[in-house]
């Protein structure tokens, strides 16, 4: 139905171009989110990752060689839920969408670089409704699906969360 994009945030720089060599970068310390964060840093042009790395890979800061990190950024691994409240401790931090929203951060206004809505992660990490096979044709599920994929739900996500929650369906699908 929707996903919350990762974004790069900072209280110290207003542009990634201002990031100094040796800057400290806060990363989520759990495997799936750290991979996602490192791939976002690559998409932003800050580092490179090993060839063949995908969203399904398990990547950590230890996989990033000096050659892949020519600016000598220091990666600080922290529990994902602590990155937004401690943002001032890092030059930049890659923060999960839900934690950013909880801290009042919005990708479109506060994010220095935001995960693309058509990224591999948008599909892989989309929030969905899972049901038992026996309920697939139930009236309540049809009603729930209609409500969650309605134009009203689409507009609510777009207007309320300002890029912090992205519908995985199009407005045309909702009409």
Question: Model regions: which residues?
Answer:
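A conserved helix-loop-strand patch within extracytoplasmic ligand-binding domains
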Residues: 1-47
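Solvent-exposed loop/turn segments at secondary-structure junctions
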Residues: 14-15, 31-34, 81, 98-102, ...
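Short helices/loops that flank or line small-molecule/ion binding pockets
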Residues: 39-40, 61-100
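Short, solvent-exposed mixed-charge patches
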Residues: 173-175
């Amino acid at each position: 139905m929707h996903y919350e994009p990762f974004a790069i945030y900072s209280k110290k720089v207003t542009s990634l171009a201002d990031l100094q060599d040796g800057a400290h970068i806060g990363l989520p310390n759990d495997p799936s989110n750290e991979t996602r964060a490192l791939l976002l840093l690559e998409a932003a042009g800050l580092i490179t990752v090993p060839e063949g790395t995908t969203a399904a890979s398990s990547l950590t800061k230890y996989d990033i060689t000096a050659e892949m990190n020519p600016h000598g950024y220091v990666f600080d691994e922290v529990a994902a839920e602590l990155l937004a409240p401690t943002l001032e401790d890092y030059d930049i931090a890659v923060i999960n969408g839900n934690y950013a929203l909880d801290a009042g951060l919005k990708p479109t206004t506060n994010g220095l670089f935001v995960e693309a809505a058509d990224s591999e992660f948008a599909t892989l990490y989309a929030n969905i409704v899972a049901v038992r096979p026996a309920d697939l044709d139930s009236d309540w599920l049809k009603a729930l699906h209609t409500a969650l994929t309605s134009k009203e739900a689409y507009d609510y996500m777009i207007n309320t969360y300002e890029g912090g929650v992205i519908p995985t369906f199009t407005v045309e699908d909702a009409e």
